[in-house]
Amino acid sequence: MKNYKLDPDEFLNFVHDIDLSKLKKNSVLFKKINNLPGSKIIYTNGEKNYAEKVLKSLGVSNLFKSIWDIKKSKFIPKPEMSPLKNLLSTNKIDNSSCVYFEDIEKNLRPAHQLGITTVHITDKNPTIKKSYVDFRFKTIISALDMINKNF
């Protein structure tokens, strides 16, 4: 946005103009997230209002303590380290007891470097195992099952 002199709010409104009508409330997802210990925070390169709409569509919005969006990150996107460090310190999070779920593999690197357990959600079968990916699952449900059983 900075390099192209775009208004951040205008850009975010444009990229988040997405039809969410295909997203449905998911009682299984609600139960699995609700069973996770500790506080839950959404960390997104998107904007808070968009994240809230997605969470509401899935029926899980009341399960999250907060949303740390691109604006709270001072428009510094993942996978940069500084916004993640700021999120962790502001929320007084113990890195060693934290689990970071992500669908973009490279975004896991900073979390892993900080001692956070990393979980990559992807339907692809990567041929190369990355050292900064602790676990890989095809669905968020299977990842939540493992975390709820083992952490």
Label the predicted regions.
Residues 3-16, 64-68:
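Short, basic/glycine-rich phosphate-binding loops at helix/coil junctions
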Residues 20, 34, 47-151:
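Asp-based, Mg2+/Mn2+-dependent phosphohydrolase catalytic module
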